[in-house]
C-alpha cells in the first residue's frame, strides 16, 4: 500500500540540511539514507548513496522526484548463471 497523502513524503532531516548547506558546492553529498524520498530541492545535486559496501554517486534530475534514493543504487550483484558444463568436454 502506498503511503498516506496526509502524512507527506518521508525524508531524513539531516539529509535536507546537507543539501541546503551544499547549495553551490560540486562535491557529492554522502548519505546512507536510502529510504528518503527525492524532493525538488535535491534536483541538480550529486548524492553518493550507500549500497552496503560503497557509495555510488547519482546526479538528481527532475524525473527522479518522488522516488526513493535506494532505487538508484543497487545492493546486489548478479554474476550470471553457470554455463553448460557438458559442452566443454
From Swiss-Prot:
<keyword id="KW-0689">Ribosomal protein</keyword>
<dbReference type="GO" id="GO:0003735">
    <property type="term" value="F:structural constituent of ribosome"/>
</dbReference>
<dbReference type="GO" id="GO:0005737">
    <property type="term" value="C:cytoplasm"/>
</dbReference>
<dbReference type="InterPro" id="IPR005732">
    <property type="entry name" value="Ribosomal_uS19_bac-type"/>
</dbReference>
<dbReference type="InterPro" id="IPR020934">
    <property type="entry name" value="Ribosomal_uS19_CS"/>
</dbReference>
<dbReference type="InterPro" id="IPR023575">
    <property type="entry name" value="Ribosomal_uS19_SF"/>
</dbReference>
<comment type="function">
    <text>Protein S19 forms a complex with S13 that binds strongly to the 16S ribosomal RNA.</text>
</comment>
<comment type="similarity">
    <text>Belongs to the universal ribosomal protein uS19 family.</text>
</comment>
<dbReference type="Pfam" id="PF00203">
    <property type="entry name" value="Ribosomal_S19"/>
</dbReference>
<keyword id="KW-0694">RNA-binding</keyword>
<dbReference type="GO" id="GO:0000028">
    <property type="term" value="P:ribosomal small subunit assembly"/>
</dbReference>
<protein>
    <recommendedName>
        <fullName>Small ribosomal subunit protein uS19</fullName>
    </recommendedName>
</protein>
<dbReference type="GO" id="GO:0019843">
    <property type="term" value="F:rRNA binding"/>
</dbReference>
<dbReference type="InterPro" id="IPR002222">
    <property type="entry name" value="Ribosomal_uS19"/>
</dbReference>
<keyword id="KW-0687">Ribonucleoprotein</keyword>
<dbReference type="GO" id="GO:0015935">
    <property type="term" value="C:small ribosomal subunit"/>
</dbReference>
<keyword id="KW-0699">rRNA-binding</keyword>
<dbReference type="GO" id="GO:0006412">
    <property type="term" value="P:translation"/>
</dbReference>
